[in-house]
Amino acid sequence: MRSEQVLKDYYSGKLAQRIQLRKLELAYPPQPENEVKIRVSESSVGDPTEREVLSRVMDLRLATLERRLMCVEKFLRECERVDQRILHLRYRKEYQWVKVAMDVNYSRRTCIRRHNNLLIELSKYLAWEE
């Protein structure tokens, strides 16, 4: 996944939303129905809990989304204050580059250059995912 799309998903809240949806999918998996409606139950007392824990541990999709979220948060913590502001204005508030530049008192070109450098740095954080 491209680093710019990861930032868009993070700032729009889609990344956190995907994590919550995946947790719900794991907590309440779809029940397969057969024509006879026979329910096979296991006698183990802790089995539902055990299944839930194992499915969460083994779920690669959820782990990938959570790692992506942690990587973005760590990346943003380590960024300079002005770079955080540029990303916030660009992705959270969806400002055009001219308005971002006016807000941080840099030229439009400098903001774009810093943004491009940030995307390269973020892609290094996310490199192990791909």
Functional labels for PLM-detected ranges:
Residues 1-75, 99, 128-130:
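N-terminal interaction/assembly modules
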Residues 78-95:
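Short amphipathic alpha helix immediately N-terminal
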Residues 93-110:
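Helix-turn-helix DNA-binding module
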Residues 117-126:
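C-terminal flanking helix
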